[in-house]
């Protein structure tokens, strides 16, 4: 341990960022070495030589030994004294700075009282009023005339320069004000012109300082109702600019095409923008039409999704609506310059049909808007915890119902005309009457519902058409009603058949029939029954002598169209009646046995006759054929 030595650890001396200022260095030299008067060159050389031979480590060790000799209590007393001195100096400096600040503030309060009051102490505010201290120059030194002349020249120059600057600023402000007035006048004139044409001008909800024009429909879907308001901006020259926001630049519309098989046979016209597209009214009309068309296609797509069971198909930008087995309607949203399909064939009739469908869907959307307005003006329903769903508009369903009903009418009318032609070719008089769309009657005037809404409301109700006619025998008739409904279940088209057959009062067809083949089979079967009942009546009503010698036919199997007669000598004959849409066939058979024979025992007819509607040959009538077959 005797070999150990003590090493003092000192902090690393860092260089100062900024050197001490010259006055501070002079003050340090005076405090350490005294005044400069006591320094000489010889004394400085001696101090330099002493510093060269001096051991700095030894000096530090002596200082450490002296410091270790001091007691701990003395060090604390010395520390407290130094701290008290520092605090006293700081308080004194703060007090002197406060006095100086109060003095300057009181002096400035004569000229700028409000600004000076903010820097005064509370004691000074209560002790001295504002502006009580002022300063002025006492006995200023005289200035020469040249200096006064220069000051006046400089002051005059500054005033002239300020006057010129003020004049330039006033002229610029005047020209700018004139330009602004002209721009504002032009802007407000165009705004008034828009208002005079019937458009609603209002403030924007989120920009209270901006005006907007309401061109949309207030009863539309909230998504499109909010888009029906555009800002009326002003350009630099004062022209009115319509800020359409999310509305596309090109005008768009719903296009309706008719496809038959794989060919497009008809296409509707999309509304084109006005020729004067630069005017503000044309832009408003274009924006209104575009928003209306977008809402129309949105509602069509929304309704088409719930009509999947009716055969309606949807794609990304296409709706396919079936009309018949070979024809369907295509709806899509396109730009105004794409309204014509390049693959479409030239067909004026189908183009008119496509335009009619396009106008119909627009009318139905407008009718839905009016219904929304009517519901909104009525008292609200009771509150419910669940939010009421927004029902889909009836746009596609009325059109589908009308086209489907019309297709069934054409089919039934064609069937009845074919049967009438066959019967008339056989000399059977018949009369048919058709009342198409009997549900669309004359409108009753009403003060509550406008006539336009009443007309549109009729097409939303189920469609009803009636076909009636007389059959062969007296008092025999039939009646067919076609009912089509796509709004409420049951959906589709149904036939309601009723017949009046005095010879067969118990025969009644099914009440609701949905298939056309069944309707065709029922109607031909009823007519065949009536023909079978008319043949025996015709034989009995013949009053001449030749007719008395004829045989009388009896109906054996009416639903099979079979009649027979049995003569006195035991001869038996059978008559077979077959009726279809294309022809009427009657055959007679000679039977060798008595009446107990089963139907169809004979293999080849003895007499037969077929009547067709389009047959150019002259054929005997049904009465003549029955008379010939009744000969003994």
Curated annotation (Swiss-Prot):
Cellular compartment(s): Nucleus
One term under GO cellular component: mediator complex
Protein's GO biological process: regulation of transcription by RNA polymerase II
Recorded GO MF terms: transcription coregulator activity
Top-level taxon in the UniProt lineage: Eukaryota
Region of interest called Disordered, as start-end residue ranges on this chain: 1-21, 50-72
Description of how the protein assembles with itself and partners: Component of the Mediator complex.
Protein name, per record: Mediator of RNA polymerase II transcription subunit 17
Species of origin: Emericella nidulans (strain FGSC A4 / ATCC 38163 / CBS 112.46 / NRRL 194 / M139) (Aspergillus nidulans)
Lineage of the species this protein comes from: Eukaryota, Fungi, Dikarya, Ascomycota, Pezizomycotina
Gene for this chain: srb4
């Amino acid at each position: 341990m005797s070999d150990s030595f003590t090493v003092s650890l000192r902090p690393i001396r860092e260089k100062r960022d900024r050197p001490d200022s010259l006055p501070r260095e002079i003050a340090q030299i005076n405090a350490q070495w005294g005044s400069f008067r006591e320094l000489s060159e010889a004394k400085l050389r001696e101090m330099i030589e002493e510093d060269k031979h001096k051991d700095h480590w030894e000096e530090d060790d002596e200082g450490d030994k002296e410091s270790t000799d001091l007691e701990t209590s003395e060090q604390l007393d010395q520390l407290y004294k130094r701290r008290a001195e520092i605090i006293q100096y700081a308080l004194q400096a703060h007090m002197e700075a406060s006095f100086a600040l109060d003095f300057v503030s009181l002096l400035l309060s004569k000229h700028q009282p409000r600004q000076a009051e903010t820097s005064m102490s509370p004691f000074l505010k209560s002790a001295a009023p504002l502006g009580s201290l002022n300063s002025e120059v006492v006995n200023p030194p005289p200035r020469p005339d040249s200096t006064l002349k220069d000051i006046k020249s400089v002051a005059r120059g500054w005033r002239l320069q300020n006057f010129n600057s003020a004049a330039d600023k006033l002229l610029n402000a005047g020209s700018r004000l004139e330009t602004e007035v002209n721009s504002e006048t032009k802007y407000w004139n165009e705004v008034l012109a828009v208002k005079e044409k019937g458009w609603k001008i209002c403030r924007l909800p989120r920009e209270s300082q901006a005006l907007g024009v309401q061109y949309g429909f207030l009863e539309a879907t909230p998504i499109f109702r909010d888009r029906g308001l555009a800002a009326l901006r002003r350009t630099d020259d004062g022209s009115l600019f319509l800020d359409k926001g999310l509305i596309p630049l090109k005008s768009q519309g719903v296009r309706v095409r008719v496809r038959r098989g794989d060919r497009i046979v008809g296409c509707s016209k999309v509304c084109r923008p006005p020729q004067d597209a630069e005017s503000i009214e044309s832009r408003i009309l274009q924006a209104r039409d575009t928003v209306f068309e977008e809402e129309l296609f949105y509602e069509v797509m929304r309704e088409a999704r719930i009509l999947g069971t009716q055969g309606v198909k949807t794609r990304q930008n296409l709706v396919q609506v079936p009309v018949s087995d070979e024809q369907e309607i295509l709806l899509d949203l396109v730009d105004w310059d794409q309204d014509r399909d390049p693959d479409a064939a030239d067909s004026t009739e189908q183009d008119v049909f496509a335009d009619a469908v396009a106008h119909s869907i627009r009318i139905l959307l407008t009718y839905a808007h009016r219904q929304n307005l009517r519901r909104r003006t009525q008292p609200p329903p009771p509150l419910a915890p669940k939010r009421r769903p927004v029902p889909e508009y009836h746009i596609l369903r009325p059109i589908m119902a009308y086209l489907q009903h019309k297709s069934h009418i054409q089919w039934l009318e064609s069937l009845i005309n074919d049967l009438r032609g066959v019967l008339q070719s056989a000399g059977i008089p018949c009369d048919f009457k058709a009342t198409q769309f009997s549900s669309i009657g004359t409108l009753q005037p009403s003060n509550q519902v406008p006539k336009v809404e009443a007309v549109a409301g009729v097409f939303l109700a189920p469609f009803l058409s009636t076909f009636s006619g007389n059959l062969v025998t007296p008092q025999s008739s039939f009646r067919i009603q076609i009912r089509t409904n796509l709004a409420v279940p049951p959906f589709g088209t149904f036939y309601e058949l009723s017949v009046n057959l005095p010879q067969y009062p118990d025969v009644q067809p099914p009440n609701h029939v949905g298939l056309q083949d069944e309707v065709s089979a029922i109607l031909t079967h009823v007519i065949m029954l009536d023909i079978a009942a008319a043949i025996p009546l015709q034989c009995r009503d013949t009053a001449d002598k030749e007719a008395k010698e004829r045989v009388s036919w009896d109906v054996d199997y009416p639903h099979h169209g079979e009649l027979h007669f049995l003569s006195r000598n035991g001869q038996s004959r059978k008559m077979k009646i077959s009726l279809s849409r294309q022809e009427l066939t009657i055959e007679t058979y000679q039977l060798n046995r008595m009446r107990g024979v089963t139907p169809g025992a004979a293999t080849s007819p003895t007499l037969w006759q077929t009547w067709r509607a389009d047959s150019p040959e002259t054929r005997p009538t049904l009465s003549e054929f029955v008379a010939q077959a009744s000969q003994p």
